[in-house]
Amino acid sequence: RKVIDTYNMEWREATRFYRQVKTAAYEPTHESKKFDFSFSDGKGRQLLLMYVVPILVGLKIVDISLYNQFVCGKSSKPLMDIYKDSDKGKWLATRLLNRNEAFEVEEGKSVVTVEQKIQQLYDAIFVTEYTGNVYHTILGEYEFDDNSKNFVKSVESMLSVYADYNI
């Protein structure tokens, strides 16, 4: 709903958006036993399915140039617009906190903001170049790697194992 409101989608666009998101990722985001998301990399994939794929679908419908900037690692604006000032964004950022981080001053922890955590999420998916020494990024209980970007793009295109055209 937040994507629809943020991008002022008309009825036709909103209907198309719901249909595409549902087709692309409904089953794995609704308590399916068919997919295992119990480890950190699986939790990362589940987070991508629930929080990033809908943004990609919405951007592709309303603003293809912003979509291209977003997936090429040039603009985190869509992710910020959706989550920065929302309760869902605060919840998401809390889950992305590492053990040594907090939103308020605590002994032995560095202070971070919701915006910083959302930016770190964006960077882990679309900006970080994973090489031999840097092969993954851990944010809280989630793991992202060099496949994360291709993963969200394939799910968004409805060409992944998660797509279900019978819904």
Q: Residues of each region from the PLM?
A:
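Charge-enriched interaction surfaces
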Residues: 41-48, 66-69, 73-75
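Conserved C-terminal helix/linker of AAA+ ATPases
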Residues: 28-54
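Non-catalytic, well-ordered alpha-helical scaffold segments
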Residues: 11-15, 19, 46, 50, ...
